[in-house]
Amino acid sequence: MDKETYVSEIKSGLKGLPEGEAMIEEIESHIEHHLFRSFQEGKSEEEAMQTLLQAFGTPTDIVSSFKKIQPVTFRAFLMFHLFCNSALFAVGIAITIMHVWLESPFVQAVWKGISVSVWLILAAYMIYWVLIGYQGVKEFGKRGEKLVLHTILISMVPNVIFMLVFLFNVIPAALFQSLLTPWFVGTCAFATLLFPLFGRMGCYIGRRQLV
């Protein structure tokens, strides 16, 4: 089987599927990269196609694996990360309320622990946005990059709302006095603007892993 026949059978199998064109583009990119690497190693076209079949499977195998991916997966990916980020804010709000209204030693200990770890928490939070990009590309390939950007922009909504609420003093800043220094607030605001960039970094890492 030559390359043209191989690709043609895949195109025929994926024709009409949601995101079918993006799938085909992604597959062709991997095929080209694999063949180029085989030719660099001095293999003939026949040998290169043999290694391609061993690595990727037959066109039927590829079509079957891609048909298992349901469009709802895209929505599930977006909703999962929107839920995760919103849940983090909900937990933060709950801890703040308990800190203000309860005289619990446990709550005070948690608050103190957060107070001395804000920079570490921020670093871990930035890594989370990188992981969104990484996971998106690992799960969906090249077609996942737009999904990652869309997911990040929507998931950022709680962050932007909180930033505006804090800047306009809707919530008294005194409640967070032990947590939020001016320097830390500025860093958080700047980091929020960079969330899409962190996502792109994750996409880049994911693409490198796919190769």
Curated annotation (Swiss-Prot):
One GO CC term, this protein: plasma membrane
Domain of life from the UniProt record: Bacteria
Transmembrane segments: 77-97, 113-133, 152-172, 179-199
Lipid bilayer topology: Multi-pass membrane protein
Pfam families noted in UniProt: HAAS (PF22564)
Subcellular location(s) per record: Cell membrane
Main location class: membrane
Assigned keywords, A-Z: Cell membrane, Membrane, Transmembrane, Transmembrane helix
Keyword Cell membrane: yes
Record protein name field: Uncharacterized protein YwdD
Species, as recorded: Bacillus subtilis (strain 168)
